Amino acid sequence: LETMPSGIELVDEFISHEGGVPCSTNIMVIGDPGVGKTSILLDTLSSIEKSGRKCLFISGEMGRKQMFKYTKRFKQFGCVTTLFLSDFLEFNSKDVVEQVLSKGFDCVLIDSIAEIVDSVRDDNRWDRKTAESWLVDTCVKNNKGENVEEKFTSFLLIQQVTKAGDFVGSNKLKHMTDAMLEMRKESDRDGGGTYLEFTKNRKMLY
């Protein structure tokens, strides 16, 4: 299975045997707010883009002003092609996402599933289940290369968890992912470090 190395050795070796993000796969990262999910995945995405791959960051969490502040600390993030949903509030978010993804990308980072689903649900007067099913179907469609450039898109999907640390989402959403990574921050008593572990690992990962 072809992979997209980020050039970040620790990340590449952790994600797959071949090193990097495998093509046509969906990797979900869950964890508490502020633990660093966006920073790590944006760093990975920007490195993949520098290697010559066509990448996209779909931001439902941050607007342009927030991203500008972010790039002051992490300059490499400013080079990533980004779709800010907040730029298109007068349009249907479903149509905006579909139109942009139809161009074809090698790797897409979505931050976050909850924000995209809520936006699409509100714009179309759907229930959450219908909006979530639309997102799953859209990802799978692009996994199969059903876009202008026939690229077999991989998705990095950020999702929040409940206060108890449980995954938020339907079984359909859970089943469409090839791997699920949980990101946690240790208490200061335990060293205060951040760690990643696979809670689901199917198809291409160790």
Language-model region placement:
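Acidic, amphipathic alpha-helical patches
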Residues: 17, 96, 170
